[in-house]
Amino acid sequence: MANDLGIAFYITICCIAFIISKIILTILLYKRWKQKNVIYEEGFSGGKVVMFRSPVLQSLTSDVLLKKTLKLSNKDIIGAGGYGTVYRLMINDTLAFAVKRLNRGTADRDKGFERELEAMGDIKHRNIITLHGYYSSPHYNLLIYELMPNGSLDAFLHGKSMESKILDWPTRYKIALGAARGIAYLHHDCIPHIIHRDIKSSNILLDQNMEARVSDFGLATLMEPDKTHVSTFVAGTFGYLAPEYFDTGRATGKGDVYSFGVVLLELLTGKKPTDEAFLEEGTKLVTWVKGVVEERREEYVLDSSLSSCPVDEINNTFNIALMCLETDPSKRPTMAEVVKMLEQIKSGSAVTDS
């Protein structure tokens, strides 16, 4: 009996020592990450500002940044979304940022803010918007992003006459491939994997070279590598949501694939997913396109500005969009497969359902 108690005591001590060592290791790894990635972290007016390492921030101090931020007004607004308002922050003639202000309203909103930081902190990819830092206070939170000079894909395709511009086919293809690569990186290469949950043309921003950058992780859900879904509140935008959202309330990577398929249709048709003409008829872009396909009148789908573009490239992209828009999620490709198929278009290979 005494021998058994001794063994149990020994095992308990070993378990406690193991747990403590894991905690210490986690703290050390976090401090190492922080030393490597954080330029400064300091209090300011009851809040805290954290900036990550970046060449563009070498000479910028938190005092200058926050003084400029506190002067933002409605005239600086460049966009708004479900999680907050976006402002243009001009530091000087050559340095500017996009600042998203998130109002602190509920505990859920705070959790969303922390989730966004966790998702964005270490992500570095040419097709994903860069998070430079954040400011957290009892009253509001600020996310500080790189500013994209060409705005959003939505503005180019559907903006007012002074904003919208004609995009040629090579540019549309480049945007589609870049956005696909960014989403695929979130799905397959980030640990934990990330489901965006709000893929749409207004969340695809364009840099000075018209390269796509996937933005707005305020609605991002982190997915453990061994999980296939996350059961949380449904977030997204009408016209882009996969049909299974309304049945199950589950966010999945295949839901993002569906939303990306809608973006491909926008690029091909030039139409908004919830165009007024569709709403008047009680339908939407996806339903309209599928109806036209069933009637074998695909030529009526394309944006008129694409009439002289390479037919094979257009048709292959259209086929990829339809694969992404399969009603059954299991029949949709993964984003990695979508990237591969889009890359095949320029190589001259025929796109087939994988």
What are the roles of these predicted feature ranges?
Residues R181-I194:
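Protein kinase catalytic-loop region centered on the HRD/HxD motif
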Residues S73, V289-S330:
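C-terminal lobe substrate-recognition/regulatory segment of protein kinase catalytic domains
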Residues D256:
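Conserved catalytic-loop aspartate of Hanks-type protein kinases
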Residues D247-G253:
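Activation segment
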Residues S330-S354:
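Regulatory extensions flanking the kinase catalytic core
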